[in-house]
């Protein structure tokens, strides 16, 4: 006697399952996703194509394929998320590359440089293709630095991105060989410098920033120490501390201000720069130098101001000084600006903490 298995109870073969899946996928190709999901909760996963997991090393991109790639940043205004508002700065920060700088003594230095490039974005534009900023800068990176070279890079990415305003900032550590005070030794002092080219409303400004590290001896503490010695024969020492001034200057149009020129100005204003190579005679000289130039943070700001005012190549400027106190558990700070370029109602909450220079 033969026993027949009902068709409903028979398991489909693999071949039958593959045919059914192919039919389901063909149907899903021309069916709204909501209808596919309504068929069964697991249906969307079943109809998803089987993708290759191996990296296609031999695949090449032709013009037709490139043209088919989605470009969301250049999409219509309907894709904008949030308010349709103008963005003053959008771009990339801290891409690094070696840049060649010319020095005042007719030498060249190649220094690792951190570059930030931004443009303005109109309210009706979705976004920008940020890689264009990098490509524009790289096109000029082999040339020795000058503000004219930066201007050409800025012109390129303003044109490529169809933006009205743009900015390039370059940050690097600039080495200068400096002599000790008395021993005749020399050592390398490194200065944090940043250069900016700002194009806003068709007006361009060249800006240079310099961090200058110096020692500040408190004039009050110096007098109190001398009083103790004189009146009571009591040995006492005044307090002094490492201090930092961030000097920002606008270079007047058509003028050339070398990095070394700005260094000379700030050194003449406050001569107690921290030292590199120090023997005993240098340490004694530094103590004498500090005693001859005691300085409050207010004095420092005004001394830098006087030096900057004396140079006709410098327009607007700002001095931010921080005396990182050895007496107090807080710092003494000052900000002095001249001209509208650096004037601001608000200060960056982390402005003064950015002035700490650590090894």
UniProtKB/Swiss-Prot annotation:
Pfam families listed in its UniProt record: GCHY-1
GO biological process: tetrahydrofolate biosynthetic process
EC nos: 3.5.4.16
May be catalytically important (site feature) positions: 218
Coiled coil regions, renumbered to chain: none
Top EC class for this record: hydrolase
Taxonomy, superkingdom: Bacteria
Keywords: Hydrolase
Disulfide bond sites: none
Listed GO MF terms: GTP cyclohydrolase I activity
Pathway(s) annotated for this protein in UniProt: Cofactor biosynthesis; 7,8-dihydroneopterin triphosphate biosynthesis; 7,8-dihydroneopterin triphosphate from GTP: step 1/1
UniProt catalytic activity: GTP + H2O = 7,8-dihydroneopterin 3'-triphosphate + formate + H(+)
Family membership noted in the UniProt record: Belongs to the GTP cyclohydrolase IV family.
Protein task: Converts GTP to 7,8-dihydroneopterin triphosphate.
NCBIfam families: PRK13674.1-1 (NF010200)
Record-linked PANTHER family: GTP CYCLOHYDROLASE MPTA
Name under which the protein is recorded: GTP cyclohydrolase FolE2
């Amino acid at each position: 006697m033969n026993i027949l298995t009902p068709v409903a109870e028979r398991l489909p073969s693999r071949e039958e399952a593959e045919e059914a899946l192919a039919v389901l996928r063909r149907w899903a190709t021309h069916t709204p996703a909501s209808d596919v999901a309504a068929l069964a909760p697991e249906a969307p996963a079943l109809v998803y194509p089987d993708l290759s997991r191996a990296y296609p090393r031999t695949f090449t991109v032709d013009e037709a394929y490139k043209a088919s790639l989605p470009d969301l940043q250049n999409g219509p205004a309907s894709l904008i998320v949030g308010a349709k508002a103008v963005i003053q700065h959008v771009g990339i920060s801290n891409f690094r590359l070696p840049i060649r700088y010319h020095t005042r003594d007719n030498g060249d230095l190649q220094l690792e440089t951190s570059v930030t490039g931004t443009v303005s974005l109109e309210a009706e534009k979705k976004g920008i293709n940020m890689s264009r900023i990098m490509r524009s800068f790289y096109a000029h990176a082999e040339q020795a630095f000058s503000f004219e070279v930066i201007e050409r890079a800025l012109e390129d990415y303003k044109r490529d991105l169809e933006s009205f305003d743009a900015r390039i900032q370059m940050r690097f550590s600039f080495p200068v060989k400096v002599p000790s005070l008395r021993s005749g030794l020399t050592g390398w002092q490194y200065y944090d410098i940043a250069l900016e080219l700002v194009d806003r409303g068709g007006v361009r400004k060249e800006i240079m920033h310099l961090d200058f590290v110096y020692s500040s001896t408190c004039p009050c503490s110096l007098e109190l120490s001398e009083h103790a010695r004189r009146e009571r024969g009591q040995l006492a020492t005044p307090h002094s501390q490492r201090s930092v001034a961030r000097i920002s200057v606008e270079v007047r149009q058509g003028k050339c201000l070398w990095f070394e020129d700005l260094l000379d100005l700030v050194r003449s204003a406050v001569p107690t720069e921290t030292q590199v190579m120090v023997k005993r005679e240098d340490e004694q000289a530094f103590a004498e130098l500090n005693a001859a130039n005691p300085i409050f943070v207010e004095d420092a700001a005004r001394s830098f101001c006087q030096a900057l005012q004396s140079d006709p190549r410098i327009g607007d400027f700002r001095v931010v000084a921080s005396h990182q106190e050895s007496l107090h558990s807080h710092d003494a700070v000052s900000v002095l600006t001249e001209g509208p370029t650096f004037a601001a109602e608000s200060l960056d909450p982390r402005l003064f903490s950015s002035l700490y220079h650590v090894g």
